[in-house]
A protein has these predicted regions:
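Polynucleotide-recognition surfaces of large bacterial nucleic-acid defense/processing enzymes
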Residues: 1-147, 151-162, 245-421, 426, ...
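Short, low-complexity Ser/Thr-rich regulatory SLiMs
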Residues: 6, 167, 237-239
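Basic, amphipathic alpha-helical recognition segments used for DNA target recognition
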Residues: 10-11, 160, 166-232, 242-243, ...
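Short, functionally important structural connectors and interaction interfaces within domains
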Residues: 89, 115, 119, 128, ...
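Glycine- and acidic
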Residues: 113, 146-151, 158-160, 182-197, ...
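Extended Lys/Arg-rich polyanion-binding regions
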Residues: 116, 121, 166, 192, ...
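A generic short alpha-helical patch detector that favors 3-5-residue windows
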Residues: 180, 225, 293-300, 551
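Terminal accessory regions of large proteins
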Residues: 268-269, 275, 281-293, 313, ...
Length: 626
């Protein structure tokens, strides 16, 4: 930037050249300077009175800003009404913060040990980015007060609705979101509050507008957005109730749209049901609509995905239109029609469109959740995440003539494998029962009847029906990018990719733990963290590892016999299979010794310690978290 100032008091305009966008050294900038001297309409020549700079807090030399922008600062500032009074800092995040899926669900909420905690996150507007918990026990809060590094926000701003954002943005734009009630926040998620809820919603709409983004760039052209950058902004409120009503209505709709998107994924605290199940139900109205649109109504995943895709598009473009309408309103309020346009680029709309591979993988994850009882086809939302398993699920049991459960040694006698689930205080048979022993093997062949592929196929058949099973499995396999038979593709996904995807989605804090013998795939099995018991590893060893070893011995003996009588060509093929089985058997032999050592210890875990601490206790027999 080159500047030519008149003498103080600077009531006349100075001349400014904006050369920062021109690359190529001083010679290029010299040429551009000469060009600007000859042609003031070149696009990078500006005239501005230095008196205007002082109208903006911090007096930035914003010579390119139009006079209407300066006049906007002649109104009240947001800081006149905003409440901001410190943030909470733990001093030891590893000890006091958890992802919301790590700890028992019954310990989460106001008045309990763990509460929701905003700590920034990716660029997102209106709602979301809260997936963290903070320890809010008496002892933890005392630590925050007394520790020389930690601090705690004053009590009067605990659990209030407000506006939060991410302190450090990797995006030129800044996303402002509703901080929901019953949440806390830390310094990575600065937050402000208001006594007037309507004003808060109005300001949330304003902050997500193009005009506000321009102001932020003036006040602080860095990646940080501090509270002072927000409280210093102009506030034009209370002058046009009709206009304010329109803004607030749009903001409330945008919050609802963003919440609907956020809650469609299972890492949300308010997740209810997977979209490909939600959109699979064929009501009479939907059947009529399908036929009207020329589709043959079928209860298949392809149809569910098509409806989900349309719902995502509707939400996406409705939010885009609403944001553009908010931009129009604020551009008109501040008279910047010649400077700003209301259009919003699609890349800046922060709700998600449908994604076939992502959504099919998340369906698989949801199915695994149903296998372990975390979710259920009979009850929406989180069903079991710690606590008394028998209060949520129980096996059908023998009863006497009076209807009382018959027990032996204090243990009720179960009948078959059927489970019942407690739905709002009423016991009913499970449509898709959870795995009884919390152990699901992942095999490269059909060694176990209840291996994960078999259970997944049953899940798909249960949800979508037997008549469409094969085409549904093919749809899933195609979405996973497989080229072989659908069941083989699905098996390969569970064997090679499921756990890694799970770790990514759950931010390296997995709730489904993969017991893994090594690269030869000699043995793999999943358990659900919240159902872990001290004897779980012993049961893995005796009921699954030993069984797998027995099957390897049988398969190896069979192959050796077949090789002895095989032709040359067939012998080569069988020998290759034999080598693979022998390698797997050897790998499993070594693994059995490791798991034997742990099984004998009957190790207990405390879910409040978090995944990182608990996983480390078994790291020698678990898959590496990547």
């Amino acid at each position: 930037m080159y500047v030519c100032f008149p003498e103080p008091p600077c009531t006349e305009k100075g001349c400014y050249l904006r050369l920062v966008d021109f690359r190529g050294g001083m010679e290029v900038q010299r040429q551009k300077t000469l060009e600007a001297i000859k042609n003031h309409n070149c696009g990078f020549y500006y005239e501005q009175s230095a008196d205007n700079f002082s109208k903006i807090p911090g007096s930035p030399v914003a010579y390119w800003v139009e006079i209407q922008m300066y006049r906007a600062f002649e109104t009240e500032k947001i800081g006149k009404y905003a409440i901001s009074d410190g943030q909470t800092k733990t001093g030891n995040n590893d000890k006091y913060l958890r992802m919301l899926w790590e700890v028992p669900a019954f310990e989460i909420g106001r008045g309990k040990r763990w509460v929701l905690h905003a700590k920034g996150g990716a660029f997102r507007r209106w709602y979301g980015n809260i997936d963290t918990l903070i320890d809010w026990s008496d002892s933890a809060r005392e630590h925050y007060r007394s520790d020389h590094v930690a601090r705690i926000a004053p009590e009067y701003i605990w659990f209030r609705r407000g506006i939060c954002w991410t302190l450090i943005s990797s995006n030129k734009l800044h996303g402002f979101r509703l901080l929901q009630e019953n949440s806390t926040f830390n310094l990575a998620a600065p937050s402000i509050f208001f006594d007037d809820d309507r004003m808060m919603l109005y300001i949330l709409g304003y902050l997500n507008s193009k005009f506000s983004q321009e102001i932020i760039a003036l006040l602080n052209p860095t990646l940080n957005t501090n509270i002072s950058d927000i409280t210093s902004q102009p506030l034009n409120y209370g002058k046009s109730p009709e206009c304010e009503d329109a803004i607030i209505e749009l903001v409330e709709t945008n919050i609802s749209l963003s919440k609907s998107d956020w809650d469609s994924f299972e890492t949300s605290w308010d997740f209810q049901i997977h979209p490909l199940l939600r959109y699979a139900a064929l009501t009479p109205q939907r059947i009529a609509q399908e036929e009207k649109n020329g589709y043959l109504p079928m209860n298949g995943i392809a149809d569910a995905y098509r409806h989900w895709e349309q719902a995502c598009d509707d939400r996406f473009y409705q939010l885009k239109a609403n944001e553009e309408e908010l931009n129009r309103i604020f551009i008109d309020i501040y008279g910047l029609q010649d400077e700003l346009t209301p259009e919003v680029e699609e890349k800046d709309v922060t709700v998600r469109k449908a994604d076939l591979t992502r959504d099919v993988k998340s369906l698989i994850s949801y199915a695994v959740g149903c296998m372990f009882g975390r979710y259920s086809l009979d009850h929406q939302g989180l069903v079991y995440a710690g606590g008394d398993w028998e209060q949520t699920y129980h096996r059908n049991v023998l009863v006497d003539e009076g209807g009382n459960a018959i027990s032996f040694g204090g243990i009720r006698i179960a009948v078959g494998k059927n489970y019942q689930i407690n739905v709002d205080g009423q016991w009913q048979d499970c449509t898709y029962p959870p795995e009884a022993d919390n152990i699901i093997p992942i095999c490269d062949d059909e060694y176990f009847e209840d291996d994960i592929v078999g259970r997944f196929v049953t899940f798909i058949e249960t949800v979508y029906g037997k008549n469409t099973l094969e085409e549904n499995l093919k749809f899933i396999a195609d979405a996973l990018g497989g080229k072989s038979q659908p069941r083989d593709v699905i098996r390969s996904y569970f064997l090679n990719d499921f756990f890694n995807d799970h770790c990514k989605i759950y931010q390296k804090r997995p709730i489904y733990w993969q017991f893994d013998s090594g690269k030869k795939n000699g043995f793999k099995a999943l358990i659900y963290l919240h159902r872990y018991q001290p004897d779980t590893i012993a049961r893995i060893r005796t009921d699954y590892v030993h069984e797998q070893q027995s099957r390897y011995r049988t398969a190896i003996a069979d192959l050796e016999q077949r090789i002895a009588g095989a032709s040359t060509a067939e012998r080569v093929k069988l020998t290759k299979q034999l080598k693979k089985l022998q390698d797997q058997a050897e790998e499993l032999h070594v693994y059995e010794e490791k798991i034997h050592h742990l099984a004998d210890q009957m190790i207990a875990i405390d879910l409040d310690d978090g995944v990182k601490v608990n996983y480390a206790k078994f790291q020698d027999v678990l898959a590496k978290i990547k």
